Amino acid sequence: MVEWKRQRIDWPYRALEGRAEDHVGLSGTLLRVIMEEPLSERTLLDVGCGSGRLSFALTREARRIIGIDRSAEAVVRARDRALALGLDHVTFVCCDAETIDYRDLGPIDLVVANLCMSDEILRRAAAVLEPERFIAFAAFHQDQWRESGKTSRYAYAEGRLETALREGGFEPVYLGVEQEVVHFADQDEALSYLESAGIAGKWKTDGRWEGFLIYLKSGGRDLTTKAHVIVKARRR
């Protein structure tokens, strides 16, 4: 049985002032577990590729990369960048990762994803992968923004993710949780952080703002700004 590995970093808010936060950056652990595979012999499927952040990080190593995303604008940006870089082994396709049959994209040896995962994606990945091939991904953990009182429908708890992997036909070989928590001296610091990070506007429309205010008024002074699960699993 694979045990969960946990990493948590705590920051005082003052240490972050003036530094733009990047909540969609690539995990070094994710890159490591992907690059453990012989990528020069592999065709990769990058699910929810966006403008290609993960795909472009792997272009030197991979034999071929196919990125898929439902945002036509993001796919155009990715295609333009691949063309500018002369990368003829990288392809980007505009489609819905939860409805397309991955087998229609051709043989796939390794499925990867950065912060785009669902039970349906796991099922479709299992359908395209041969036994002993792998999926490796980062996904949101249920503790992401937990102080707001609202959990993303795309976020996983450890137990639910293990169940989804097992039911999808995967055997985990690496399971990790990476967290970053910011500590505030007072409520004003917390609200200032949300404004400077560009989060406030979205939270005011999706219900998180009111939940976070309630948390602050009750004396809470932390915010889990990053909570991701990092997974590598073998197709059974």
Tell where the protein language model's regions lie, with residue ranges.
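Class I SAM-dependent methyltransferase "Motif I" SAM/SAH-binding loop
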Residues: G48-G50
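A short acidic, Gly/Pro-enriched loop at the edge of an enzyme's catalytic core
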Residues: Y102-L110
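A short glycine-rich, Lys/Arg-flanked "PGG" loop and its adjoining helix->strand segment in the class I
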Residues: I121-F134
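Conserved class I S-adenosyl-L-methionine
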Residues: M1-S40
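Conserved Class I S-adenosyl-L-methionine
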Residues: G176-R236
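Class I SAM-dependent methyltransferase SAM/SAH-binding core
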Residues: R53, A57-T99
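A short SAM/SAH-binding and catalytic strip from SAM-dependent methyltransferases
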Residues: D109-L122
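Short, glycine-/aromatic-enriched active-site segment of Class I SAM-dependent methyltransferases
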Residues: I135-Y154
